[in-house]
């Protein structure tokens, strides 16, 4: 005796049709203008910065050693930020090579005193006058990599400044360093081709007493297969006390023998 049975594909087609309709509706909604959502509640007043805590430098990638990313200044605020005008512009002459895997300018500069320190996609370092934007010195590094050429920032260290000791109970004290060196103030950069370089923050010259003539080979001891883009260093070095902490970027799905990620301090 024949008995009609619902084809197995019918429910699947129905679910598929509903899914497609939902996707079309979501795509359509992306292009519909939405009303501005305003914050509710009372607007908080602007609180003046305590003159004793007024910040004068941005000497770490994230502003301070703790990476707070917020600056204790109130000269520019929500009431006057719309009136800002460009004071100066500086061109490094180091060209990018397009988006994607090429050279890109992704740098966050540092400001220490009246100097601004910045780096180019090929790790050339510049010191500029903060008021005029004029070049004070240039340290040529000219790093090269097959892909992912970028310098996201530099690190600054002044051995003549008093060290900030940790306040956490049981923490290891920060070890003091010599102050009578060739470079009492230094700027550090790490490159995509695996180098950590130190230059004199006052002159831009290599610090010969660091590593080998101012350079540490970050590929040493990592084994084979470390050529960029397998192993690269693009993020700014981190100054932790008197140590320079360096990370790494490992490419995905390039080979079966990829190098391991490594974090080191010098």
Regions found by a protein language model. Name each.
Residues 81, 111, 129-130, 191, ...:
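Short, acidic, Ser/Thr-enriched surface-loop or helix-capping motifs
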Residues 39-100, 134-143, 165-166, 170-175, ...:
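Aromatic (tryptophan-biased) beta-strands that constitute blades/sheets of beta-rich domains
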Residues 121-123, 130, 140-141, 192-193, ...:
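An acidic- and aromatic-residue-enriched active-site/binding cleft used to recognize and process polar
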Residues 58-62, 101-124, 148-195, 229-256, ...:
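Repeat-blade elements of multi-bladed beta-propeller folds
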Residues 1-3:
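Membrane-embedded alpha-helical segments of integral membrane proteins
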Residues 5-33:
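Internal/C-terminal transmembrane anchor helices
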Residues 127-128, 135:
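Aromatic-anchored glycine-rich loop motif in surface-exposed flexible loops
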Residues 193, 199-204, 259-266:
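Beta-propeller blade signature
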């Amino acid at each position: 005796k024949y008995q009609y049975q619902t084809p197995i594909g019918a429910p699947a087609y129905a679910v598929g049709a509903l899914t497609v309709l939902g996707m079309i509706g979501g795509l359509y909604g992306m292009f519909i203008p939405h009303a501005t959502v305003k914050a509710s509640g009372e607007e908080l007043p602007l609180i003046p910065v305590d003159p004793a805590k007024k910040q004068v430098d941005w000497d770490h990638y994230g502003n301070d050693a703790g990476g707070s990313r917020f600056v204790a200044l109130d000269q520019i605020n929500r009431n006057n930020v719309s009136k800002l005008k460009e004071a100066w512009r500086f061109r490094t002459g180091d060209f990018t090579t397009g988006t994607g895997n090429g050279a890109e300018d992704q740098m966050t500069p540092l400001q220490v005193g009246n100097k601004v320190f910045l780096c180019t996609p090929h790790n050339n370092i510049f010191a500029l006058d903060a008021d005029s934007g004029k070049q004070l010195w240039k340290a040529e590094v000219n790093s090269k990599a097959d892909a992912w050429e970028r310098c996201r920032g530099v690190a600054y260290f002044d051995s003549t400044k008093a060290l900030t000791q940790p306040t956490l109970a049981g923490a290891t004290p920060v070890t003091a360093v010599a102050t009578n060196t060739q470079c009492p103030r230094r700027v550090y950069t790490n490159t995509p081709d695996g180098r950590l370089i130190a230059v004199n923050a006052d002159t831009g010259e290599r610090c010969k007493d660091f590593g080998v003539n101012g350079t540490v080979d970050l590929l040493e001891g990592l084994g084979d297969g470390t050529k960029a883009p397998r192993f690269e260093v693009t993020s700014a070095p981190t100054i932790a006390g008197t140590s320079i902490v360096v990370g790494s970027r490992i490419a995905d799905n390039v080979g079966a023998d990829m190098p391991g990620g490594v974090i080191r301090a010098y």
